[in-house]
């Protein structure tokens, strides 16, 4: 039996993000690219992360930083809670929560990632980190307050 994809899709990895991470296919939209990039973090694939960063970002210079992060970070799960894009605009956004442990402490990245499509391929550009009040509902959709969920 194959393993489930780390991206949280509940689909086997070989049928989900593997074709993108392996280079067999190009991610068809920002959500698939973001999910496959999360898998690359889980599987410590710096080459895929660098390849899918927009060339203007100079991602190759981040290789050492990525490799150092791999050694100290364990990824625990991904929740995508919003995505929007239009192929005609060549720009898209994906909002997500990625949970991890680092140095024995649990944390979460909550980001609205921006993607750009050039020559038929989507690239990660950058992301913003929205601010949430401690008593706001958690954006991951758990129904809990932010302070009792991803804000810990």
From Swiss-Prot:
InterPro entries: NTF2-like_dom_sf (IPR032710), SEC_C_motif (IPR004027), UPF0225 (IPR023006), YchJ-like_M (IPR048469). Pfam families: SEC-C (PF02810), YchJ_M-like (PF17775). SUPFAM superfamilies: NTF2-like, Sec-C motif. It comes from Shigella boydii serotype 18 (strain CDC 3083-94 / BS512). Belongs to the UPF0225 family. This is UPF0225 protein YchJ.
